[in-house]
Amino acid sequence: MQRICVDMDEVMADTLAEHLRRYNQAFDEDVTTDDLAGKGLWEIAPLDRQAQLRAFLDAEDFFEVLDVIPDSQQVLESLSTRFEIFIATQAMVVPNSLGPKYRWLQRHFSFIPPTHYVFCGTKSILRADYLIDDQPRNLTRFEGQGLLYSAPHNLEVTGFVRVNDWLEVADYFARVVSESKAAI
């Protein structure tokens, strides 16, 4: 059975929406995802706000209240009947996110067993056939087929197979299944 690794933040969990909500509330701003086309929030926030940006991520509740990216649950559950699904998240970048991320996955993706959660510091350790991720640097180091999941910060990035939403992910893997059946 082929293996798909899936990033959590900005692919399954809407981390950016929560980060923007807290940023806008704390600084009385109205930054939108449109303002971030080709950039990350860290790139547009003034230097004197960088520590607070990090503090938002370090908040105990941050990773527990994230919205689910539309269609991710249904598509991943469907894919799990034909592929081995692993969730790979760089939780070590925000160490106190491990518990909240675990609980979030249990609550929203209970069909994926905890033995298929990979909490890591670098995704270069992953060995799978596919990786769905919003960070180009993770796909560059990946030895299988990388799929760049669209997010405001990566809209100008080229050189990867791009998927804009979970319905495009479903279509991509439907073609993979169809091609593998045709090859038999």
Label every PLM stretch briefly:
Residues 1-52:
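Active-site neighborhood of HAD-like aspartate-dependent phosphohydrolases
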Residues 1-6, 178-184:
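Non-catalytic pre-domain segments flanking phosphatase-related domains
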Residues 44-59, 83-86:
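Short, basic/glycine-rich phosphate-binding loops at helix/coil junctions
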Residues 84-86, 130, 147:
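A structural signal for isolated positions on well-ordered beta-strands in alpha/beta enzyme cores
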Residues 86-97, 156-167, 171-183:
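Membrane-proximal envelope and lipid/glycan-remodeling enzymes
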Residues 88-141:
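Substrate-recognition "cap/lid" segment bordering the active-site pocket of phosphatases
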Residues 132-167:
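Acidic, Mg2+-coordinating phosphoryl-transfer loop and its flanking beta/alpha structural elements
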